[in-house]
């Protein structure tokens, strides 16, 4: 009886040990090629290049809830900016400009070990996208500066009577995507992960909000985009 209890206890310990989910954190870079015509058609915006147009900064956290499946959250962010010395509005005023496009993924990932160090994975991911445009203007002309800025995208008058020296306009949208990945384990906890796939986004330039008021923002074609990512990850058992 004692030996049977010992065997059952050993089996329980092994089962619990192997069934514990794994938590992993990753950092990396993404690459894609959007069509941001709303920025390209206006010369005051920074000239497009690989850093401000194609490169995405990536971080993510994944939770292994089954022996061959993970869920998590991952973000890819594009950043652009221009200081007031080089950013002059049509009303001859200057401002500090910054722009972010962030794609928040909520991935469901399945995987299998092809070899001890090599993993093949497939990811499906709902997307919550957000873009933010910020202007840091000089009081007391911040309202005029914002009006001048928005005329680059639309002739519609905004219904605002005041603005802060630093303010921003925001747009949110939803989308989906999928990716096929290859992972190489350097150790049992550290690995490189290379993925490629596509994403579709339902962005609408007419659905921007500035201090609660709906405004028109830049035209961006970010649907049907191929996307690549390379990241390094560390797993916590």
Regions found by a protein language model. Give the residues of each.
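Residues that define the transmembrane beta-barrel architecture of outer-membrane proteins
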Residues: 21-23, 51-57, 95-104, 118, ...
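Short glycine/proline- and aromatic-enriched beta-strand/turn motifs that initiate or cap beta-hairpins
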Residues: 19-74, 233-237
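Outer-membrane beta-barrel proteins
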Residues: 34-40, 80-86, 131-137, 202-207, ...
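Predominantly the C-terminal beta-signal and adjacent terminal strand-loop region
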Residues: 173, 178-237
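Gram-negative (and chloroplast) outer-membrane scaffold detector with strong preference
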Residues: 60-156, 184-189, 223-237
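Positively charged n-region of N-terminal signal peptides that target proteins for export
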Residues: 1-5, 20
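Sec-dependent N-terminal signal peptides
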Residues: 4-15
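Extracellular loop and loop/strand-boundary signature of outer-membrane beta-barrel proteins
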Residues: 41-49, 89-97, 162-168, 213-220
């Amino acid at each position: 009886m004692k030996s049977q209890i010992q065997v059952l206890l050993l089996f329980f310990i092994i089962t619990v040990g192997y069934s514990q989910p794994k938590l992993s954190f990753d950092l990396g870079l993404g690459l894609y090629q959007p069509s941001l015509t709303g920025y390209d058609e206006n010369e005051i915006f920074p000239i497009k290049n690989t850093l401000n147009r194609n490169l995405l900064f990536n971080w993510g956290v994944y939770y292994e809830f089954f022996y061959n499946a993970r869920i998590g959250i991952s973000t890819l962010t594009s950043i652009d900016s221009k200081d007031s010395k080089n950013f002059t509005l049509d009303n001859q005023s200057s401002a500090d400009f910054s722009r972010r496009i962030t794609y928040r993924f909520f991935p469901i990932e399945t995987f299998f070990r092809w070899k001890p160090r090599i993993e093949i994975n497939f990811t499906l991911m709902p997307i919550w996208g957000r873009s933010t445009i910020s202007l840091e203007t000089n009081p007391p002309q911040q309202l005029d500066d914002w009006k001048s800025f928005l005329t680059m995208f639309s002739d519609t008058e905004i219904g605002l009577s005041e603005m802060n020296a630093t303010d921003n306009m925001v747009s949110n949208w939803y989308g989906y995507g999928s990716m096929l990945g290859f992972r190489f384990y350097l150790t049992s906890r550290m690995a490189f992960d290379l993925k490629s796939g596509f994403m579709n986004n339902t962005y609408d330039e007419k659905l921007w909000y500035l201090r609660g008021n709906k405004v028109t923002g830049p035209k961006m074609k970010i649907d049907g985009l191929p996307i690549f990512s390379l990241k390094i990850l560390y797993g916590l058992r």
